[in-house]
Amino acid sequence: MSLNNHHPELAPSPPHIIGPSWQKTVDGEWYLPEKTLGWGVLKWLSEYVNTPGGHDDPNRLATLIALSEAGLLDNENMFIPTDEQVRLVLWWYAVDDQGQYIYREGVIRRLKGWGKDPFTAALCLAELCGPVAFSHFDADGNPVGKPRSAAWITVAAVSQDQTKNTFSLFPVMISKKLKAEYGLDVNRFIIYSAAGGRIEAATSSPASMEGNRPTFVVQNETQWWGQGPDGKVNEGHAMAEVIEGNMTKVEGSRTLSICNAHIPGTETVAEKAWDEYQKVQAGDSVDTGMMYDALEAPADTPVSEIPPQKEDPEGFEKGIEKLREGLLIARGDSTWLPIDDIIKSILSTKNPITESRRKFLNQVNAAEDSWLSPQEWNRCQVDLAKYLDKHGREFAPLQRGDRITLGFDGSKSNDWTALVGCRVSDGLLFVIDIWDPQKYGGEVPREDVDAKVHSAFAHYDVVAFRADVKEFEAYVDQWGRTYKKKLKVNASPNNPVAFDMRGQQKRFAFDCERLEDAVLEGEVWHDGNPVLRQHVLNAKRHPTNYDAIAIRKVTKDSSKKIDAAVCAVLAFGARQDYLMSKKARSGRVVMVR
């Protein structure tokens, strides 16, 4: 699976934009696939599928008027996707040089009211009768589609009410032309085509789905697959497993999940998909062709942070305006959403803040025992405008000779090994390298780690270094002997580098709190490294006997690693030691005790 040689330079995407549909190039153009069946699918939709509503949408009316004036309007009820949905179709039907789909599964996560059901209903009709299967490349090298033989589309959900949302749209969206030309027999929960295809609902037991041979499966509202809104466990995971098994038997078969943001810790199908996507981004999982596309409100969109109107009228108005800006971003091109009504719902004390963020800001909230939330961490990713406003100078990328501190946490085989830096001048956290033992035959290459440490000292002005000694004691001792004259503060009493976590739990806990405070106050930055992000979000709060909160894994044997987060704490703590030392002010070495 590849996108051929189509590699324009991409503009950096802020953390609230996830996936391809809102990705732009450095030239400000939309990043689109070089080869896609999507253009043919879009043309087919405009000819055969009706809109389920939205006649008063200004953008839709403008499009209809333009088509009418050009003499191209055959059906005033025609389905007109938004620009955002057009890009989603183009990416979903992207193919490689052999005409194979780039993506074998997809997740579209959007806020409530975005139009997920009408959009997927349109795709279901295209999968039943439209040109969704690769036929050949034309003379210009563009892929040409054809209808899929034996099309079997399943709209799956864990409750019948969820499938009703989609199936109630089909009678309206199926045009007379579509019904006549393709011989559709439309029933309440199943639709047949004259060519032998079908669209069916599936909400029964997973066992009854065994052996099916679907060509396209919509997994509806997967944020409730596993645990429903009532808190009760359902058969969502079993359904997903059966669907995966059925899909794998049929060449070119794919699943598309639609969902709102999930509730962390419920272990739903939506949460598992999000976790898997993040593992792929962090290099911890193989990319098997998942298109994960989400559009969130920016991390600094306020809700609970908005002050009471009576106490601070000016602050209230500014907060509401900032909330509105966040909602306008999260809604994408769904201009029909009633933003003022949504704001009122968010402000109502009847509605939990976490639910408002999940439903309307499309944000994945942190679990209660999480160290930091995704929004809190995302707010600290380097943003050039915010950086300039805070520091009064432009952000400078890392360069040779920058003064930094280091944090190191090593493991021979059980956990990952990581080396993280923190720039002294602005608190920029960055990953120097990370080693997953599974990528090296089950054991971290300690010689490579050693070489990377020496390389860091050669490249940067390292003034402090904290390294946990466990499983790397000989190397840590050697680093201390080699660089003790260069380092300005000691990691622990009488040792320039060694920071034995087993005996330094109190200092580590307080540094966890200091870094947490720095993140919340915007006093630290990071470069958006996906591994560091994942490890930070994996970290759980761990109360200690020292009246301070440290971090740890969710369980000792959990596969959700936090090693890079530990290194970030060590590097940040080393920076704090250096800044508080006399050496940072006067040039004289002072040992920190």
UniProtKB/Swiss-Prot annotation:
Family: Belongs to the phage terminase family.
Domain of life where this protein originates: Viruses
Name of protein: Gene 13 protein
Source organism per UniProt: Mycobacterium phage L5
